[in-house]
């Protein structure tokens, strides 16, 4: 493996699956008999804001359970960033809305789909740390003071992902692009591998099983994230000592 000045890592739901993050979907893809798309869109929030808040309040409470912790894959990526400090940069672009990367110690994390432990004011656009339930007819925006303007700081269906300009800039300088625990179905993230290749990066997929865009990667390794990610990180760090 050649020396890398910049490693960009895209993470999806697969990296957090072993940490006890509930998907809140049953076998039919439903949440309390509602399609998830019906509680995760701007139109849904307009039609029934209380239902949307209930959905995200449950997800937020689940994330804050003591049983939900970073797993070995998260801690391995934090180790990679720390030990390559001074030799190169490690960026994590995550589709996940949890904070497990940060809790594991990663610093350079971009949340392209938002963050569950933050709220956003629909009146001002300001974003706030938020760890309790959002109750529309009770909670006021800490900034403007308006009632009923707070929503989860989450990118809903039909909304533009966050940090896209910054992500493109990072991809343009990336030597190695790695996708971990992603389905390859969700765009624009599923297209990052092509963007990275366009800029000359080597590409690697670490996944539980083959994803929809697996054929685009130069190499793929399959298995549980908590197993294959630490092994890969150890290999990268071992190679870096030879440089």
UniProtKB/Swiss-Prot annotation:
Its main location: mitochondrion. Substrate binds at residues 56, 59. Its cofactor is Zn(2+). PROSITE patterns: SIRTUIN. It comes from the Eukaryota. It is found in: Mitochondrion. Keywords: Metal-binding, Mitochondrion, NAD, Transferase, Zinc. The active site is at 113 (proton acceptor). Binds 1 zinc ion per subunit. One of its GO terms (biological process) is post-transcriptional regulation of gene expression. InterPro entries: DHS-like_NAD/FAD-binding_dom, NAD-dep_sirtuin_deacylases, Sirtuin, Sirtuin_cat_small_dom_sf, Sirtuin_class_III, Ssirtuin_cat_dom. Belongs to the sirtuin family. Class III subfamily. NAD-dependent lysine demalonylase, desuccinylase and deglutarylase that specifically removes malonyl, succinyl and glutaryl groups on target proteins. Has weak NAD-dependent protein deacetylase activity; however this activity may not be physiologically relevant in vivo. PANTHER family: NAD-DEPENDENT PROTEIN DEACYLASE, NAD-DEPENDENT PROTEIN DEACYLASE SIRTUIN-5, MITOCHONDRIAL-RELATED. This is NAD-dependent protein deacylase SIR2rp3. The lineage of its organism: Eukaryota, Discoba, Euglenozoa, Kinetoplastea, Metakinetoplastina. The gene is SIR2rp3.
